């Protein structure tokens, strides 16, 4: 069962942990046209999720991902 993080400070502390392996970034457009971004961090025991509704803030959060973690970006493309 994934653990949901509510605070940015908690998300950043999980990224710095030595057991953090990879980050998957999901960028999904909602019906209203807003872009919602979810960050999923895989650690040894849990999958931690962090959701950001603001696109500008999401870009800043994505820039804070350390380079030693494997990063995968998935966008929702429906025609």
From Swiss-Prot:
InterPro entries: Ribosomal_eL38, Ribosomal_eL38_sf
Gene Ontology cellular-component terms listed: cytosolic large ribosomal subunit
Keyword Ribosomal protein: yes
Domain of life: Eukaryota
GO aspect biological process, one term: protein-RNA complex assembly
Keywords from the UniProt entry: Ribonucleoprotein, Ribosomal protein
Pfam family, one: Ribosomal_L38e
Gene3D superfamilies assigned: 3.30.720.90
GO terms, molecular function: structural constituent of ribosome
Cell inner membrane found in the keyword field: no
Family label: Belongs to the eukaryotic ribosomal protein eL38 family.
The protein, known as: Large ribosomal subunit protein eL38
Organism: Theileria parva
The gene coding this protein: RPL38
